[in-house]
Amino acid sequence: ILGSNYALLRPEFHQIRDRVLSRRSSNTRSMVKNILISIGSSDPYNITLKVLRSIKLLKINVNIVVVLGSCAPYLNTIREYAQCNTQIKLLVDVNNMANLMSDADMAIGAGGVSSLERCCLGLPSLTIVTAKNQVSLAKNLLENKCHTVVSFSNKLDSYKITLGIEELYKNYRLRISMSKNSPKVCDGKGGARVVKAVD
């Protein structure tokens, strides 16, 4: 069973989906106030730091929530960076990702299932492909104008990330378009479809 229609998201994404999408569609605020950064639980390449430095370079005055797992090899580096910047709130081993996505105006996140979680809640996103198995989905999201995408490589530089963040942050119409397009890709009911398919 393949495809985003069968993505196994946690139940809370479907539970809050209608409320979140309704709020996004009626939101007339053109400015971004809250940015969520989640480049996977471990983020072994420390892409999170590149993202934070890009935001600093752009002089974006917003609230930033960074999510990492306790297993992240660069956790202490990010913790030290956050301690020097009152904009940044670092959260470790969270169990309320749906609510964090609900509160965000835009996100910078990894590809894979987490990108479908963002789609489910209509969260405008810059998706950073961090593994080969994420390429196909990321390409689909880009073609359907759901997310903007930066492909990861060993030579991934902050310049590409900075441009992607700047475009998403400044372009209100782009964010509105993403909020409309991305929920069509994933509705959070994949678990129910899987159960029905195997019965």
Model-derived regions, located:
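A nucleotide-sugar donor-handling region in carbohydrate enzymes
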Residues: 1-46, 75
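A short, well-ordered alpha-helix in the C-terminal region of glycosyltransferases
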Residues: 167, 174-188
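Acidic donor-binding loop of glycosyltransferase active sites
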Residues: 102-113
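Glycosyltransferase donor-sugar binding loop
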Residues: 64-75
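C-terminal alpha-helical cap of glycosyltransferases
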Residues: 187-199
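Nucleotide-activated donor-binding/catalytic signature segment of Leloir-type glycosyltransferases, i.e.
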Residues: 77-93
